[in-house]
Regions:
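Sequence-structural signature of the catalytic-core scaffold of metal-dependent phosphohydrolases
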Residues: 1-91, 99-350
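Terminal helices and disordered tails flanking the catalytic cores of nucleotide-processing hydrolases
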Residues: 272, 277, 286, 296-465
Length: 465
C-alpha cells in the first residue's frame, strides 16, 4: 500500500510516512525540534550549519526503518509482529532527541536533579544526579500529551508507548522488556542498537547531514553498502530458559566500509564538532551557565514537561538579550574568546614537551597572573564508545567542559558483531581500526578575550622562546 505522505529530504531523498506517524510528527513535542539547531553554535564557524534536530529526527526514523528491513530480509516474522517491531523502532528513532535543551548539549548544566522529573522506575540508578536530555526524552514521551497521542494512534497496531520508551531507556522495567520476546528470541537488543550503538541510525544520519550543511566532505561514507550488509546475530540465552537475544551484525565484506564510517566520525569531531570558534563560545556559555546554576534562577530549565517544551533556541537567546550578565552580553554581541594555544597528542606517542614549552596549566596561570581573561579546556577521548566484555572505548567528548555534561550511568551497549562464514565475531576482534586507534587523543586549548589577544601573544612568546 502506498504511503499517504512523502517528505523530501536533501540527505535521504524521499521519506515515506504513514498517517499515524504524521499525527505524532505534527505534535508539539516533535515540532519543537524545528527551533533547536542540530549543531548548537557551530554555525559561527560554518554558516550553513543551521539545520535543526527536527530534520535529523525524521532522517533517523527513516534510517531505523531501513535498518530493520535489512536485518529481517531473510527472516520470517508474523506480519503483525513485523509491523509492530518496525513501527516501534521508527517511533523510538523519531523521538530519540525530544529532550534536547536549547543549543543541543550546551545548556544541560541548567537541568534540574533527575528526581524532579518523576520518572519512577524509568529513572534507573542514582536519582540524585542531574537530569540529562535522555531523561527529558523519557519524561516527554511518558508524561506529556504525546503519550496519549501514541496510544490513540498506535494501540490498534500493537505498539505501546512503553515499548518505545523501552528502546530509548538504558534500564527499562523488566515487565516491558518481555514484550519484545517472539518465538524465543529477544528483539530488544537489536532494536536498541538500531537507535543507539556503534552503528546506529542516529550517527549514520548526523554524519551525513552535518557534513552536508557544514559544507565539508569529512562525514561522507558508504551508507548503502553498510545497510545492505546488516545481519541479525542470535546469541545464547543469559539463563537456561531465557530468550535468545538478537544483536546487530555486519557481514565481513562491509568491514572496510565500517572503518571508513568510523574515520568519518573521527574527522568530523576534529574538524567540525571541536572547531575552535564555536568551542570558544561554548566556553563562555559554560561560564554563564555555571553562574546561573549557582545564583539567579531566571535561566534554570524547568522540570515540568509542559514548561520545558516552551524552551528552544529563540527563547534562550531572548533571555540572553535581556540579561545583564557579562558572559551573556559577549554571546549576544558575538565577542567570543579567541584561540591562543592548541596542542594535540595521542597516548601512544607520549611525546615530551618541546624544549622550553610550558605545560598548558602553567600557561594559563601565567596569563591570569598578568590580568588576562583566560578560558581553557582539555578534551580527551577515543575513536569509539564501543563496549564489550573484553575491552571498552570511551567516546570522543563534545566540546563541553567537565561538569557541563552530568555524569550518567549507562548500560553496556549490546555487542556489535561481524559475520564471516557463518561465525559471529565481536567487532573489535575483526576490525583492525580499533587496534590502530585504541589510544586516547588529548586536545588542549587556551582561549583569551579578543581585547587581550595581542598582549597574550607577547607574553606567550616570552614564556616559550
Amino acid at each position: 500500500m502506498r504511503a499517504p505522505v512523502r517528505i523530501r529530504d536533501p540527505i535521504h531523498g524521499t521519506q515515506r510516512v504513514t498517517k499515524s506517524e504524521i499525527a505524532v510528527i505534527d505534535c508539539r513535542a516533535v515540532q519543537r525540534l524545528r527551533g533547536i539547531k542540530q549543531l548548537g553554535l557551530a554555525d559561527l564557524a560554518y554558516p550553513g550549519a543551521t539545520h535543526t534536530r527536527y530534520a535529523h529526527a525524521l532522517g533517523v526514523m527513516h534510517l531505523a526503518g531501513r535498518m530493520f528491513d535489512a536485518v529481517t530480509l531473510d527472516m520470517w516474522l508474523d506480519p503483525a509482529d513485523h509491523h509492530r517491531l518496525r513501527t516501534t523502532v521508527r517511533l523510538a528513532a523519531l523521538f530519540h532527541d525530544l529532550g534536547h535543551a536549547p543549543l543541543s548539549h550546551s545548556t544541560e548544566l541548567l537541568m534540574p536533579p533527575l528526581a524532579e522529573l518523576k520518572l519512577g522506575p524509568w529513572a534507573g540508578g542514582h536519582p540524585g544526579r542531574r537530569a540529562t536530555h535522555e531523561d527529558y526524552t523519557l519524561a516527554i514521551l511518558l508524561s506529556s500529551g504525546l503519550s496519549e497521542l501514541v496510544r490513540e494512534r498506535f494501540d490498534d497496531q500493537g505498539v505501546a508507548v512503553e515499548d518505545v520508551a523501552s528502546i530509548l531507556s538504558d534500564h527499562p522495567p523488566s515487565d516491558f522488556s518481555r514484550r519484545f520476546v517472539i518465538d524465543g528470541r529477544d528483539w530488544r537488543p537489536l532494536l536498541r542498537q538500531c537507535v543507539s550503538s556503534e552503528l546506529d541510525a542516529d550517527r549514520m544520519d548526523y554524519l551525513l547531514r552535518d557534513s552536508y550543511y557544514a559544507g565539508v566532505p569529512y562525514g561522507r561514507y558508504d551508507l548503502e553498502w553498510l545497510l545492505e550488509h546488516l545481519r541479525p546475530v542470535e546469541r545464547p540465552p543469559a539463563s537456561e530458559n531465557g530468550p535468545r537475544p538478537l544483536h546487530l551484525g555486519l557481514a565481513s565484506r562491509a568491514s572496510f566500509g565500517f572503518e571508513d564510517y568510523l574515520l568519518s566520525r573521527y574527522h568530523m569531531f576534529l574538524a567540525v564538532y571541536l572547531h575552535h570558534v564555536p568551542v570558544g563560545y561554548e566556553l563562555m556559555l559554560d561560564a554563564l551557565n555555571r553562574e546561573e546554576a549557582e545564583g539567579a534562577d531566571a535561566m534554570k530549565l524547568p522540570a515540568d514537561v509542559d514548561a520545558y517544551l516552551e524552551w528552544d533556541d529563540l527563547h534562550f537567546f531572548y533571555l540572553l538579550r535581556r540579561s545583564s550578565n557579562p558572559w551573556a552580553r559577549r554571546l549576544v554581541e558575538r565577542r567570543g574568546f579567541r584561540l591562543l594555544v592548541e596542542r594535540t597528542q595521542q597516548d601512544s606517542e607520549q611525546e615530551p614537551l618541546r624544549r622550553g614549552q610550558l605545560p598548558i596549566r602553567e600557561v594559563v596561570e601565567r596569563l591570569r597572573s598578568e590580568g588576562i581573561a583566560v578560558r581553557a579546556h582539555d578534551v580527551k577521548g577515543k575513536l569509539s564508545k564501543y563496549f564489550s566484555p573484553e575491552m571498552s572505548f570511551d567516546p570522543i567528548q563534545t566540546p563541553h567542559l567537565p561538569g557541563l555534561a552530568p555524569s550518567r550511568e549507562e548500560a553496556p551497549t549490546p555487542t556489535l558483531f561481524v559475520v564471516e562464514e557463518g561465525r559471529a565475531v565481536p567487532l573489535e576482534a575483526h576490525v583492525a581500526l580499533y587496534r590502530r586507534y585504541r589510544d586516547e587523543v588529548s586536545l588542549e586549548r587556551v582561549y583569551v578575550a579578543p581585547e587581550d589577544m595581542d598582549r597574550a601573544r607577547m607574553l606567550l612568546e616570552q614564556m616559550e622562546p
